[in-house]
Amino acid sequence: MALLDFFLSRKKNTASIAKERLQIIVAERRRSDAEPHYLPQLKRDILEVICKYVQIDPEMVTVQLEQKGDDISILELNVTLPEAEETK
């Protein structure tokens, strides 16, 4: 049966093959571009602004950029603030 399918199957045209390959390449590039070049500087700038108001450890700030679909990016910022000191 597989032999019969082999001889009766139609070959894909080169345009559809090229399109599939291009889609694979584009998807792979999107995955490899995990962190934009400006993200470290953005983290430093955000940390600098936070330090104007609260004394925190730089390790307590995390910045992540997540891709959702083709045209949506989500910037997630997590800051662990120190506990408030008691005033007398």
Curated annotation (Swiss-Prot):
InterPro entries noted in UniProt: MinE, MinE_sf
Coiled coil: none
The UniProt record lists the keyword Cell membrane: no
UniProt xrefs under Gene3D superfamilies: Cell division topological specificity factor MinE
Species this protein is from: Cronobacter sakazakii (strain ATCC BAA-894)
Protein name: Cell division topological specificity factor
UniProt keywords, alphabetically: Cell cycle, Cell division
Family as reported in the entry's similarity comment: Belongs to the MinE family.
Function: Prevents the cell division inhibition by proteins MinC and MinD at internal division sites while permitting inhibition at polar sites. This ensures cell division at the proper site by restricting the formation of a division septum at the midpoint of the long axis of the cell.
Any Gene Ontology biological process: regulation of division septum assembly
Pfam families found in the cross-reference section: MinE (PF03776)
Highest taxon listed in the record's lineage: Bacteria
